[in-house]
Design a protein with these regions (language model features):
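Noncatalytic, solvent-exposed loop/strand surfaces
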Residues: 1-113
Length: 113
């Protein structure tokens, strides 16, 4: 699982960050692991990597935080994109046996609710 940053003028790769998740995670043919979109508000970049966690980066690609969401198990895999609102990163995961709606601080990854 990776997040990549490209230069908007020439398309050159500026940086790439990978997350390792060793367990097999279900996904669907029409919903691959890249279905969840990264989000930015001009201050941070946040990516949902499914069971590998929710991760915040700065614009240089430095990992600011990692939030462990636990193992997600549903036939369609991960497709929920995070939302940034004020100082919060809001994220929902489901359906499946383990569903959640959380908010973490977008700069630190600390759980707010």
């Amino acid at each position: 699982r990776s997040v990549m940053c490209f230069h908007r003028a020439d398309g050159k790769l500026l940086w790439q960050r990978d997350i390792i998740y060793k367990e097999k995670e279900p996904t669907h043919g029409t919903n691959p692991f890249c279905s969840a979109s990264p989000v930015t508000d001009g201050e941070v970049v946040v990516v949902s990597h499914g069971s590998a966690g929710l991760v915040g980066y700065d614009f240089e690609g430095k990992q600011l935080w990692h939030y462990d969401v636990g193992k997600l198990e549903h036939v369609w895999g991960n497709a929920s994109s995070p939302i940034l609102h004020g100082d919060l990163c809001i994220h929902w995961a489901g359906p499946g046996p383990r569903q959640y709606l959380i908010a973490v601080n977008k700069r630190t990854g600390a759980k707010v609710w």
